[in-house]
């Protein structure tokens, strides 16, 4: 490396829509179990765009410069002396949330609820849109030979979708309705199919997204009309032969109207899982939820076993993520890529690593 070449070029958010490329020190291993990863691909997530566009998400507020990105894959370039599961040169998917391992949620396996979570690109912690990133070996997952590094960058959103689908307890023979045909919603459709669902209906307000969903993993699609949630739910049930309703409803949109329609379209005794986040507070059809005695759950990120299952599904060929990647851009084009994702272009955009 020439003396004037950047050692750890990073894509840094300084304020709302104010970003820069900054050469930062190469991170050092802080623990004997740490590994240093040369990041090769990073997907742009809606949360990254929200921080860039608004400077905050709920209680997480940008107060100092932060490296963006958390959906990444890469190649191990250095390992700590206690690392046993990885070696230099291994291709890995990065799980970007490091838990404390000591609190009750961590010890119960629900480490996504860790009280001291350090999550990449969630203020104040830096993300993975840099040449190098350090994390513990057990949060790096070696990619099976059947998977490439682009697939690896999709393991983070797939982990989210796997967790949602496991929360919903989708089983063989189930009918599933998924609201939202963005990357996570589409992956919920794919995971539901892998888990044995026989009917999977994708719901979205963008026809082109529904066209993609039908080709990808959904058995049917539904475009809501400008009508009440009750009316759209009835159209959805009757139009797709759902009888009294779907066994499982997943909302991956966070839109209030989708939440309402989802509650109404679920069958009595069915399951409703909220995976999408929208406004902090919305109105809610509590009468319908109670009188149907719905099993209602929230879903947040991923926890024990979700990443491993995501890799197994893709590595074994039971689920494919390649179709979701609609564009790959150079690291130096990251800001333009954020603009395009905000405009709704494509399904999943990847930013190549600093080395290309």
Curated annotation (Swiss-Prot):
NAD(+) binds at residues 180-185. The keyword Isomerase does not apply. PROSITE patterns: ADH_ZINC. Pfam families: ADH_N, ADH_zinc_N. GO terms for molecular function: D-xylulose reductase activity; L-iditol 2-dehydrogenase (NAD+) activity; zinc ion binding. Zn(2+) binds at residues 45, 70-71. Pathway: Carbohydrate degradation; L-arabinose degradation via L-arabinitol; D-xylulose 5-phosphate from L-arabinose (fungal route): step 4/5. It is an enzyme of class 1 (oxidoreductase). It comes from the Eukaryota. SMART domains: PKS_ER. The keyword Membrane does not apply. Keywords: Carbohydrate metabolism, Metal-binding, NAD, Oxidoreductase, Xylose metabolism, Zinc. It catalyses: xylitol + NAD(+) = D-xylulose + NADH + H(+). InterPro entries: ADH-like_C, ADH-like_N, ADH_Zn_CS, GroES-like_sf, NAD(P)-bd_dom_sf, PKS_ER, SDH-like. Its cofactor is Zn(2+). Binds 1 zinc ion per subunit. CDD domains: sorbitol_DH. Its EC number is 1.1.1.9. GO terms for biological process: D-xylose metabolic process; L-arabinose catabolic process to xylulose 5-phosphate; sorbitol catabolic process. Belongs to the zinc-containing alcohol dehydrogenase family. Xylitol dehydrogenase which catalyzes the conversion of xylitol to D-xylulose. Xylose is a major component of hemicelluloses such as xylan. Most fungi utilize D-xylose via three enzymatic reactions, xylose reductase (XR), xylitol dehydrogenase (XDH), and xylulokinase, to form xylulose 5-phosphate, which enters pentose phosphate pathway. This is Probable D-xylulose reductase A. It comes from Arthroderma otae (strain ATCC MYA-4605 / CBS 113480).
């Amino acid at each position: 490396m020439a003396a004037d070449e950047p050692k750890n070029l990073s894509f840094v958010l300084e304020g709302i829509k104010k970003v820069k490329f900054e050469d930062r020190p190469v991170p050092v291993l802080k623990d004997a179990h740490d590994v240093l990863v040369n990041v090769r691909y990073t997907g742009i997530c809606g949360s990254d765009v929200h921080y860039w566009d608004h400077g905050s998400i709920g209680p997480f507020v940008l107060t100092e410069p932060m490296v963006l990105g958390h959906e990444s894959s890469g190649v191990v370039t250095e390992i700590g002396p206690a690392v046993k599961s990885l070696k230099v040169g291994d291709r890995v998917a990065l799980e970007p949330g490091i838990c404390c391992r000591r609190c009750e949620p961590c010890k119960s396996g629900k480490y996504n609820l860790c009280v001291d979570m350090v999550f990449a690109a969630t203020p104040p912690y830096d993300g993975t849109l840099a040449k190098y990133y350090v994390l513990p070996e057990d949060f790096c997952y070696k990619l099976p030979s059947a998977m490439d590094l682009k697939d690896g960058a999709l393991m983070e959103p797939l982990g989210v979708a796997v967790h949602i689908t496991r929360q919903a307890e989708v089983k063989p023979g189930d009918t599933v309705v998924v609201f939202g045909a963005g990357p996570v919603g589409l992956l919920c459709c794919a995971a539901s199919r892998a888990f044995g669902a026989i009917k999977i209906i994708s719901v979205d307000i963008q026809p082109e997204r529904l066209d993609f969903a039908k080709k990808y993993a959904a058995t049917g699609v539904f475009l809501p009309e400008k009508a009440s949630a009750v009316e759209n739910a009835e159209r959805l049930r009757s139009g797709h032969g759902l009888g009294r309703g779907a066994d499982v409803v997943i909302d991956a949109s966070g839109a209030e109207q989708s939440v309402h329609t989802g509650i109404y379209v679920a069958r009595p005794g069915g399951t409703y899982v909220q995976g999408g986040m929208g406004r902090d507070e919305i109105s809610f059809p509590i009468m319908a939820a109670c009188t149907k005695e719905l099993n209602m759950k929230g879903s947040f990120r991923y926890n024990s076993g979700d990443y491993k299952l995501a890799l197994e599904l893709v590595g074994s060929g039971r689920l494919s993520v390649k179709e979701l990647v609609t564009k790959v851009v150079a690291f130096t084009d990251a800001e333009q890529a954020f603009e395009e994702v905000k405009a709704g272009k494509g399904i999943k955009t990847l930013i190549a690593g600093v080395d290309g």
